[in-house]
Amino acid sequence: MKRNPVVAGMFYPAEYHELLEMIEYCYLSPRGPKELPSKRGNYTKPLGIVSPHAGYIYSGPVAAHGYKKISENVSGEVTAIILGPNHTGLGSGISTMKGIWKTPFGDMEIDNEFADKLWKECDVLDIDENSHLREHSIEVQLPFLKHLEDLNIAKFKFVPISMMMQDYETSIDVGYFIAKVAKEMNRKIIIIASTDFSHYEPQESASKKDAIVIKDILELKDEEIFIDVVTHNISMCGYGPVIAMVKAMKDLGAKTANLLYYSTSGDVTKDYSEVVGYASILVK
């Protein structure tokens, strides 16, 4: 199947040159890393990032921090496992798909072999295109990856995993099998957990709540992420994808995590009465 983008022209520009200008702005923005990716890294081990998925004007500069780190740590052919929450309520509880996703920068090919093996080994995972057709949380990551590819940083395939079910046990299962399949297939992989943090709360409340779960991520405590999201009523939409990423990365040998940048929508709109939190976090 060839999937068409559903939020191009809304979350990010649909036209090639406008999108390129926007992504370059994200890197060079005062809230971004303030420099463009400029060199090919050397892949030595798997890399995980937490990346936001709002409109680029709000969260793109935050996301650019993570993609700058990816650019410095990849080379050759790389499979990007992209986990995102299912906002639409369509399709299976946990699903991947095969085929190609279109972007304004060109097509992104799914690693069908990895997706198929993961589906066969992970009982909670279905192959279901309906989960992905209208969902934006994975789509908004692809232009950043395709941009790195166009800079000859690496050649990417990806595996989309949409998570409507985000309970702890399911999330851990998904993470376990991602790591298992990556080892069995000897793939160079990066794992991207797509999430925003607190939604539509005052800046002070949102930043305090987000700091709690960010601390858990930085300490690689997957169970505490789930407990604190529930206990503190943190309206983080992709805690399941983050738990799965942390579990997979630990199984693949990760020992450290670093907060690259935290910001809120209020830093753009200057309205701090109702904000959404965004963070870029590196796990390796």
Curated annotation (Swiss-Prot):
Intrachain S-S bonds: none
Alphabetical list of InterPro entries matching this protein: MEMO1_fam
Family, per entry: Belongs to the MEMO1 family.
Protein's name in the database: MEMO1 family protein MmarC6_1286
Species of origin: Methanococcus maripaludis (strain C6 / ATCC BAA-1332)
Lineage of origin: Archaea, Methanobacteriati, Methanobacteriota, Methanomada group, Methanococci
